């Protein structure tokens, strides 16, 4: 069983150090410390365990070290930055594991960009040696890339010419969409196994600069000092966003921000599921579905209303703790429970308590900690969007689908709401946070995506005073079905049985197509185009067949392709 929880004192492959407002994440992969047997992580290659540590470090920088302005990602190995994902590990892994591995690494790199865009940190990739494949994909997720000019070091995306697959962690998309490299040059770069060295890499826009070995560290340090001296990083921001960001930060005492500690989750693994403090996951393995229940906050009389009170609670503050638990539950299901095809999402609690939390978050959204909590909630909800499981929201008496928890319902593929006033009223409610605090990968809110055909209905929903009962929610277009008490149990049972009887492959593709209506962004191109093509290629004989390139990499045998284009 793979565990996604870790902490700096447990890291095997990364060294995280912080000096004032500068953090350094140095990659030093221990080749014998692997997630599975049968391979060694040479040349700073990585497996899922390496990336779990990276994801944890980035998360901790945001919450535990908010004063950090610059993050330098480097390597402690001489003449090598990172050789990317370990090829033998990929070649011998199941298709499902390959898919989830690439999805998680993509989410980690998107989290780096989210930090740059919304929290103002600038990430610098200091390539002290060759960065190939996933190594360059990690670098290109950063804001700036600097390569050592030692006559040997290069950057490359060699997956197509060497392995017969794609750079699966966003490389192709970021080359043309983020670095804005010309298409013809990107084509050459992506089929050139040996890659490009400093001068041409800079000329083509694949790196920002290159420095000789004797001046490399000095030059990196100078650039770091230059960025750290600026009042606040404005990477990837418009002028208006930058001004608003700086103004909000200046409202805090002398600009000083003290972080909070992210403690280990209270988590119990049981034969039939996982129990957290606020989240419960029950696995019905024979029926191939899970019940995911999220508890609302404690009574509003005890809820904090000021940033100081929130910071005092630290990671035990309900919206942060519950979303950390939800995040872990989603990852656990993805990797450890592949045959669970459907997740029934429920909530329990008082709608007014959830709305009280949202009111506090909205009122203090410019405070660094509240901002990070909101951004984290948005990332977890996007992880739910990108999870290859069906989600049905079940709204019963005692549910609290409101505000930030309403997003769980909106992220679900269907919703069922009991319409039986005699048994106890069911209701759902929006808050101001539903209007823009939790964007999807396509940049839209889930309500915007829901009402693409009728924006005026969206305005009416957001302007609605009070909660929606079942009939009102149905009329407003918020709910899929509103069965009465006579049909409730049968309708839920039949819906579960029907969904779990369908092809999981077809459902994954169908859901990915239906969940992201509206515009396309770099993120949706990565997840919906690059990832989809990579997943297809991962099953093709030219990659993984007996004579495929991935299968034969590193062997004395040569790949033989079926040259029919498909």
Which residues fall in each region the model found?
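C-terminal alpha-helix plus adjacent terminal tail
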Residues: 1-52, 57-69, 76-83, 96-99, ...
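Hydrophobic, small-residue-rich alpha-helical packing segments that form membrane-like cores
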Residues: 84-96, 100, 104-115, 128-144, ...
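Catalytic-core regions built around general acid/base machinery
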Residues: 107, 111-118, 376-384
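A short, small-residue-rich loop immediately preceding and capping a beta-strand
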Residues: 119-131, 388-398
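Short, well-ordered beta-strand core segments
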Residues: 123, 145-146, 210, 391, ...
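CoA-thioester-processing core
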Residues: 132-189, 402-460
């Amino acid at each position: 069983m793979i565990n996604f929880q870790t902490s700096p004192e447990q890291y095997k492959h990364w060294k995280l150090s912080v000096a004032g407002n500068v953090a350094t994440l140095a990659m030093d992969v221990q080749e014998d410390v692997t997630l599975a047997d049968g391979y060694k992580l040479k040349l700073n290659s990585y497996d899922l365990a390496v990336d779990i540590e990276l994801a944890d470090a980035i998360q901790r920088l945001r919450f535990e070290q908010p004063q950090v302005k610059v993050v330098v990602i480097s390597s402690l190995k001489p003449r090598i930055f990172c050789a990317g994902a370990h090829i033998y590990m990929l070649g011998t892994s199941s298709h499902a594991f390959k898919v989830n591995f690439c999805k998680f690494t993509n989410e980690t790199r998107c989290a780096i960009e989210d930090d740059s865009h919304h929290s103002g940190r600038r990430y610098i990739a200091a390539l002290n040696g060759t960065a190939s494949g996933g190594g360059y994909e990690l670098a290109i997720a950063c804001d700036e890339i600097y390569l050592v000019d030692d006559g040997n070091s290069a950057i490359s995306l060699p997956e197509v010419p060497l392995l017969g697959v794609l750079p699966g962690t966003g490389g192709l998309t970021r080359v043309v969409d983020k670095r804005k490299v010309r298409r013809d040059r990107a084509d050459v770069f992506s089929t050139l196994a040996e890659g490009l060295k400093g001068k041409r890499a800079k000329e083509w826009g694949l790196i920002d600069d290159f420095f000789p070995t004797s001046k490399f560290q000095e030059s990196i340090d100078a650039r770091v000092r230059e960025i750290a001296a600026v009042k606040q990083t404005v990477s990837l921001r418009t002028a208006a966003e930058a001004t608003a960001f700086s103004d909000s930060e200046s409202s805090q005492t002398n600009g000083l921000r003290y972080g909070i500690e992210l403690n280990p989750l209270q988590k119990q693994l049981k034969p039939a599921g996982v129990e957290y403090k606020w989240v419960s996951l029950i696995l019905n393995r024979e029926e191939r579905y899970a019940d995911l229940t999220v508890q609302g906050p404690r009574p509003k009389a005890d809820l904090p209303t000021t940033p100081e009170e929130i910071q005092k609670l630290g990671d035990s503050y309900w919206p942060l703790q519950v979303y950390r638990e939800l995040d872990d539950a989603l990852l656990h299901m993805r990797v450890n429970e592949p045959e669970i095809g459907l997740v029934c999402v429920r909530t329990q609690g008082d709608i007014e308590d959830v709305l009280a939390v949202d009111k506090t978050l909205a009122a203090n959204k410019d405070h660094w900690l509240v901002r990070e909590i909101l951004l984290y909630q948005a990332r977890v909800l996007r992880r739910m969007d990108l999870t290859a499981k069906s989600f049905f929201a079940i709204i019963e008496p005692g549910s609290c689908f409101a505000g930030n928890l309403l997003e769980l319902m909106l992220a679900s593929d269907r919703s069922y709401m009991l319409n039986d006033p005699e048994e106890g009223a069911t209701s759902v409610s929006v808050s101001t946070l539903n209007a823009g605090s939790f964007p999807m990968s396509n940049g839209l809110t889930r309500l915007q995506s829901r009402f693409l055909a009728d924006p005026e209905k969206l305005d009416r929903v957001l302007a609605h005073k009070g909660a929606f009962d079942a009939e009102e929610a149905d009329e407003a277009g918020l709910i899929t079905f509103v069965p009465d008490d006579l049909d409730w149990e049968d309708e839920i049972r039949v819906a579960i049985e029907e969904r779990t009887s369908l092809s999981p492959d077809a459902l994954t593709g169908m859901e990915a197509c239906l969940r992201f209506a509206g515009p396309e962004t770099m993120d949706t191109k990565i997840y919906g185009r690059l990832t989809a093509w990579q997943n297809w290629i991962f099953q093709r004989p030219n990659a993984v067949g007996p004579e495929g390139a991935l299968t034969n990499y590193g062997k004395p045998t040569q790949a033989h392709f079926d040259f029919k284009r498909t």
